[in-house]
C-alpha cells in the first residue's frame, strides 16, 4: 500500500525487477522515511553524507493513498511529500551533506535546492 501504483494494478518493478517508488503523497510514507533517516543518524552519528538517488521514475502512475478523484494529482502531491521529507531532514540535520542524484543531473529539480548541498 506504500508503493506508487494505481489501485488494483500489478506492481511493476524496474532496474532488474528490484526497484519501486514509494508513494510520497502518503504522510505515513513520509514519516517512515524521516524515521528511517533518524534511526540511521542516531545509530551511526558519524554519517556526514547522504546520496538521495532518484534513479527510478514513477512508471506506474497511481496512488493507493489518494482517492479516485485525486489520482490526477499524484505528481503534485508526490512532490509536496518529497519536499516535506526534505524539509524535515534538513531541519534535523543541517550539518549533513545531502546530494540529489538523478541521471547525472539530467533530472535536476531546482525547487529542492534549499534542501540539498549537491546535484
Protein language model annotation of sequence segments:
Residues 2-119:
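Active-site neighborhood of glycoside hydrolase catalytic domains
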